[in-house]
Structure formats: C-alpha cells, structure tokens
Amino acid sequence: VTKIEEIRALFSIERVGKDFREKYGRDYTEEDVQECYKRFQKVLFDTLEDYTEPIPGVVEVIAKLRAQGIKIGSTTGYTQKMMDVVIPAAEKKGSRIDNCVTSDNLPGGRPKPYMIYRNMCDLDVASRFSVLKYGDTIADIREGVNAGVWSVGVIMGSNELGLTEEETRTLPMGELKCRMAKVRDRMYAAGADYVVDTIAELPMLIEDINERMAL
C-alpha cells in the first residue's frame, strides 16, 4: 500500500467523509486526496531524516545474516524520493541493506507481490523458496503470501502492535501479552508461516527453515 493509497483509504472512511461534508459542505474529490498527499509529502520530507533510527537489534541481525551470505532486500510504501533520504540516513546509523524497491514503476505496492519479485531480480535470487519476507504489518504478511515466499511477522515494535518503546516498557505485562497474542493471531490469520516476538529470533528461525528444506 502506497502512502497516497493510505490517504485515499482514510478519506473513504465513513466518519472522515461525514466530517469533511460538515466542514466543506460537499463530498471529497480526488483533487482533495491529491492536495492532502502534497501536504503530507512536505511535512514528511521536512522530518523524514529524524525518524531513521534502527529498531533495537536490527543492525546486529542484519550483520549476522549478511555474514552468512544472506542478501537483504527491502520493500516499502515510501516513494523512491523518500527512500533517497531514508537510506543514507539509516546507513549513517549502521543499518545497511543490499537493495530497496519501491512501487513507483510497478503495477502496485503491498500486498501485491511485485516488489518482492523485483528484489529477486535485482539480487539474482532465482528460487522463491530461498526468499523470506519479514514485516510488521498485515500487508507485509500478505505480500509474502502472494509472492509464494516464506512469510514472517514480527510483533514488538510493529505497526500492528501500535505501541511506542516507552508504552511497551510501562504497559502492565498482562495487558502487553494480551495485545501481542491478538497481533500474533491476526498475522497467522493473514497467512504468516511464522510470527516472532522480536527480530533477534530471525537468525535462528532461518536456520530452522533451512534445516526443514534440507530434509
């Protein structure tokens, strides 16, 4: 899902449409969607570099996987211009990927599989069984499912969990576990092969998958 598609979906929510009519005396149009997207882009570009801090554990896990010869590709709802800001800023903080694909010149973004396929071409990976899609949203899970690759969801720090680091630390453990269980259920319902609590579990999971494939 691209950012403009998310904005378009927001406008289509009944309550949002009602509020728009009450304020402007008319239904929204595609021009309103485009204008909102332009404003969103300006705000985003002004602050984008400030939000490129890697999630705890990401840098270490990427380094470990790369040392094993695993290539790291990314799919994103951001545009290429946005990623031209994000990638260098993230690299300065230790997070380096081998390839990044946006949906700019493809038939569609997540959950369609095209960005995964483009990554496979760019990174010269011939078999879908050698690809693992790791993500924190239902769209990520479905992208992996639609591409026919291993699809793995992560809970902590995810959009699906919807908690900041501070909220995660201060939330009563029982409530946190309950929320995590609901996210896990949603991800499996979307077709995930596996769901992990944190990215730290990913290397061990990949070892397990490799062992299963070797049987």
Residue ranges and their predicted role:
Residues 1-59, 63-68, 84:
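N-terminal helical cap/lid subdomain that shapes the substrate entry/recognition surface
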Residues 59, 63-67, 79-215:
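Asp-based, Mg2+/Mn2+-dependent phosphohydrolase catalytic module
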Residues 75-77:
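Structural motif
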